[in-house]
Regions:
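Positively charged n-region of N-terminal signal peptides that target proteins for export
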Residues: 1-9
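C-terminal motif of bacterial Sec signal peptides marking the signal peptidase cleavage site
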Residues: 16-19
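Bacterial signal peptide processing site
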Residues: 21-23
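Short, hydrophobic/aromatic-rich segments at coil-to-beta transitions
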Residues: 35-41, 67-75, 133-142
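Secretory pathway targeting signatures of secreted, lumenal, and periplasmic proteins
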Residues: 48-103
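Surface-exposed amphipathic alpha-helical segments
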Residues: 57, 166-193
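Long, charged/polar, surface-exposed segments that mediate recognition or autoinhibition
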Residues: 93-123, 186
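Signature of long, low-cysteine stretches enriched in small and polar/charged residues
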Residues: 113-156
Length: 193
């Protein structure tokens, strides 16, 4: 009886950990909204969005363990790794993606507005531009960092149905990177279910 109970706990824990390592416990759909088959090479964001690897970056982590599986994130990195403090490392360039599942489209839109309201802090906005890719509108916010390990970056905040998405690319000046083009290419690699 004890062995069965321990085995059940280990099995449950391994399933949870496996789910977290593959983008959460929400499985990807078989097809996208347009009927295109799901590609297993995409990073699964909450079973609603498949994301291609940004060119020149390597996947570092993907998780769906925050806030009862409503928040998922992924990080891709490029360049030299630097230790900031014990157990904290940064790279010359990092791409972050965070998604949050909301109860409704109205709630998601309110969350988008909240994200815009929080934008700033140690960042200096240098440009703001709206682009449309595959029928999806994105607002790109370019910035310089004043108190960060990075020197500059670009952020996109948008909504897809009841999901909020925040993408950010930040880099040190040592990395020659066209942030705007990198972000546009990254956003073009999103596939919606």
């Amino acid at each position: 009886m004890k062995k069965t109970g321990i085995f059940a706990v280990i099995l449950a824990l391994s399933l949870v950990l496996t789910g977290c390592m593959t983008g959460g416990m929400i499985p990807p759909p078989e097809t996208l909204a347009d009927g295109t088959p799901w590609n297993t090479e995409w990073v699964n964001m909450a079973g609603k969005v498949g994301v291609e690897r940004p060119e020149g970056f390597d996947l570092l982590t993907t998780n769906g363990t925050l806030e009862d599986m409503t928040i998922h994130y992924a990080t891709w990195v490029r360049g030299e790794e630097t230790e900031v403090d014990k157990d904290t490392y940064i790279y010359e360039g990092q791409v972050y993606l965070m998604t949050e599942l909301c109860d409704s489209e109205a709630s998601a839109q309110a969350t988008v507005e909240q994200w815009y309201g929080q934008f700033g802090g140690n960042l200096t906005l240098t440009d703001r531009e709206t682009v449309t890719l595959a029928g999806q509108e994105f607002e790109l916010l370019s910035y310089d960092c004043t108190d960060s390990h990075f020197d500059r970056g670009i952020t996109a905040i948008w909504r897809y149905g009841s999901m909020v998405l925040v993408a950010d690319i930040a880099c040190a000046d040592t990395l020659e990177l066209d942030l705007r083009q990198t972000m546009v290419d990254f956003l073009a690699g999103f596939h919606y279910a």
